[in-house]
A protein has these predicted regions:
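Aromatic-lined substrate-binding rim segments of carbohydrate-active enzymes
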Residues: 2-81, 234-235, 239, 488
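Polysaccharide-binding and catalytic clefts of secreted carbohydrate-active enzymes
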Residues: 77-264
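Surface-exposed, active-site-proximal loop segments in enzymatic domains
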Residues: 20-38, 68-78, 94-109, 153, ...
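Hydrophobic faces of well-ordered beta-strands that scaffold small-molecule active sites
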Residues: 14-16, 55-59, 137-141, 248-250, ...
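Carbohydrate-binding surfaces of carbohydrate-active enzymes
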Residues: 196-205, 212, 216, 230-232, ...
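Short, acidic/polar
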Residues: 1-8, 255-266, 326-334
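Substrate-binding cleft/loops of secretory-pathway carbohydrate-active enzymes
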Residues: 65, 144-158, 235-288, 319-323, ...
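Acidic (Asp/Glu)-rich catalytic clusters
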Residues: 3-8, 49-50, 130, 263-268, ...
């Protein structure tokens, strides 16, 4: 009944966890239905196929799923050899309901081998059901792999296997002891010069100068390498278990930009990086969704894969703040507005430790189900998966700026991702240390980003965020690239920006001119900023953070580059437009995240003559290139333009 109801919602694929802890009876002994019929996951997969559904499998090893120990066997999490370690060598505890537990180490060879053994056993029952022989069309590797939410820069991982990987990371990066010593500000011939074989990672933030920052930024980068290596090990184990010929996915958690997850680094093992979304309807949530989804969308478009939400909330766990149906509808429509092209409804069917799904545990539809039926019909009507949101402006945040914010986080084990989810950033959560620069770098950079984003939104300029790790895929097609610099910029990224400038793209840096490398190492040669001026005579390459300068730069770019705008009145309403392959505007989203009920006016250009609300069935005329209609508080309208 539950599968029938899922199909009736308009969903084509069912996503299922396979919890290691549920299937393990003893070390190396697994039950996939031979003893307990409820554990027959292969039967469930075959039944889904009979119903015309395809299947995504999520075997972890970390699955969360609101399960105790996140689906990892108790014997594994309490095995000292498997546990992540704090700077003092203690287990790293996650204070999670119903019971706190020590999180596994992504570097632990014992843990990685234990997970591989589970995958091999699972492959014996599910690999024969992989497409095209069966309905399994994708497999997810791990889950929200941000160090089990204990992702503070100095929380972990000081496990012996992690320390060994850290030292190898430094060998690979610096090649020689002389280069390592020079990078860390030591005399290579001095008695205190660091050595690859016994160097210890930093255990707290103690930098007092840009030179001191280098080893801290390296430690933050190592976390990214650690996770990427673990994902590769998991992916290899799944391949060895027979899960071949289908894409592998991984879901980044809310606040992913504040974690060590790096989409570019996992690209070798993960085919589809998606995001998870859980939000209360609000203007803050809209801004967060815009930032996250625009970054995801431009990356995925460049890579030729759909921008996918691995989880988008329909309901909530009982130990989280409640999300009602309006919150879920607002979140889903806002993600679509900023470029999402597919989503996994979490949860479609209610279960233990979950409240508010559109289908009850007996397979009966709740009133909430009607929205999803209407949404599927609306998406099909406009062929939404073949439309795209043009974003001629790209706000580029280099990876080293994000690493710097991680190591300067001021709240210890309280994850920076928590602040990000709440709409806060470096201004609220990072140390204001000036490090001898005369200004607080991460705070000033965050202020610059917010000021620029606000100015672009007020004028209705479509833009997207880009992480520096995506510099090789997410900058093509941009008319204006604004790259954040708090005083440092890597030579590699500078060359990429210079190439864009040579191709005619307007390139701006701000709020500071970069005099150091991205990790705050001294540059062998200063950046020649004149190379960024290129074809745009009179263009000021470096833009300060003061609002008046930012406003002037945005106004100038609109005129100079003839940027299209979708300005709204009042300006707390936001518009996004999606075009077809011919560049014709086909779908307009209007978003009101505030508490105010309003009549809004939006400029849509000379083409459209009417707008049809795809969810409510109402038609509105477009007069003189403008559309006027009512938008209720905390709602989104999805309109087909004709």
């Amino acid at each position: 009944a539950c599968l029938d109801a899922t199909k009736a919602l308009g969903l084509d694929v069912v996503d299922t966890y396979v919890p290691w802890s549920a299937h393990e009876r003893a070390p190396g002994v697994f039950d996939f239905g031979s003893h307990d019929p409820k554990l027959d996951v292969a039967h469930f997969v075959r039944l889904a196929a009979e119903k015309g559904l395809r299947v995504i499998v999520r075997p972890g090893p970390h699955i969360n799923a609101e399960l105790t120990h996140f689906g990892i066997p108790e014997r594994v999490v309490w095995d000292p050899a498997c546990q992540a370690r704090s700077p003092r060598g203690n287990p790293v505890m996650l204070p999670m309901l119903p019971v706190a537990f020590p999180v596994p180490s992504y570097a632990s060879e014992v843990f990685l081998d234990e997970a591989s053994r589970f995958f091999r056993a699972l492959g014996e029952v599910l690999a024969p059901l992989v497409h095209p022989r069966g309905p399994i069309v994708m497999i997810q590797v791990d889950n929200e792999g941000a160090l089990y939410f204990r992702d503070g820069a100095y929380d972990q991982d000081y496990h012996p296997d992690a320390i060994a990987l850290y030292r190898q990371f430094l060998r690979d990066k610096y090649k020689s002891l002389d280069d390592l010593a020079a990078a860390y500000g030591h005399d290579p011939s001095g008695a205190d010069a660091p050595r690859f074989g016994d160097i210890a990672p930093p255990t707290r933030f103690d930098a007092e100068s840009p030179t001191d920052l280098v080893r801290h930024v390296d430690w933050a980068e190592f976390h990214e390498v650690l996770l990427a290596k673990a994902m590769q090990r998991f992916a290899n184990a799944l391949t060895d278990a027979g899960f071949t010929g289908i894409p592998r996915s991984h879901n980044f958690p809310p606040g992913q930009e504040a974690t060590p997850l790096n989409a570019a680094r996992v690209r070798g093992s993960i085919d589809l990086v998606g995001y998870d979304y859980y939000s209360k309807a609000s203007e803050t949530a809209r801004a967060i969704i815009a930032r996250r989804t625009s970054e995801l969308a431009v990356r995925c478009e460049a890579l030729g894969v759909p921008a996918f939400a691995c989880e988008i909330g329909a309901g909530f766990p009982p130990f989280f703040p409640p999300l009602d149906e309006r919150d879920s509808i607002f979140t889903i429509l806002t993600t679509l507005a900023y470029g999402l092209r597919g989503f996994n409804l979490y949860m479609a069917v209610e279960r233990d430790r979950w409240i508010g799904a559109p289908i009850d545990p007996e397979g009966r539809e709740r009133p909430f189900a009607l929205f999803f039926k209407k949404l599927r019909a609306a998406l099909d009507r406009v062929d939404f998966t073949h439309l795209y949101r043009r974003a001629p402006v790209r706000l580029l945040v280099p990876r080293n700026e994000r690493r710097l914010a991680r190591v300067m986080h001021a709240f210890g084990p309280v994850s920076a991702a928590f602040f990000s989810v709440a709409g806060a950033g470096a201004r609220e959560a990072c140390l204001e240390d000036e490090l001898g620069l005369g200004y607080p770098p991460v705070v000033e950079a965050d202020t610059f980003v917010r000021t620029l984003a606000s100015s672009l939104e007020q004028r209705g300029v479509p833009f997207a965020y880009v992480g520096g790790e995506d510099r090789d895929v997410s900058l093509d097609g941009a008319s204006w690239i604004v790259c954040v610099s708090s005083g440092g910029l890597s030579p590699t990224l500078f060359e990429r920006l210079a190439g864009s400038a040579d191709a005619g793209t307007l390139v701006t840096l701000g709020p500071r001119s970069p005099s150091l490398g991205g990790a705050r190492r001294s540059l062998l040669e200063p950046h020649d900023l004149e190379r960024l001026r290129s074809r745009h005579a009179g263009h000021e390459v470096v833009l300060g953070a003061d609002p008046s300068s930012v406003e002037a730069a945005v106004a100038s770019a609109i005129t100079r580059l003839e940027l299209g705008t979708y300005a709204c009145d009042p300006d707390f309403v936001h518009a996004t437009v999606h075009e077809d392959e011919a560049g014709k505007a086909r779908v307009l989203f209007l978003i009101n995240g505030t508490e105010r009920d309003t009549n809004a006016r939006v400029s849509v250009g000379p083409g459209p003559t009417e707008a049809f609300d795809l969810l409510k069935g109402e038609t509105f005329p477009v007069r003189d290139g403008a559309l006027e209609l009512r938008i209720k508080p905390k709602t989104v309208r999805m309109l087909a333009l004709g």
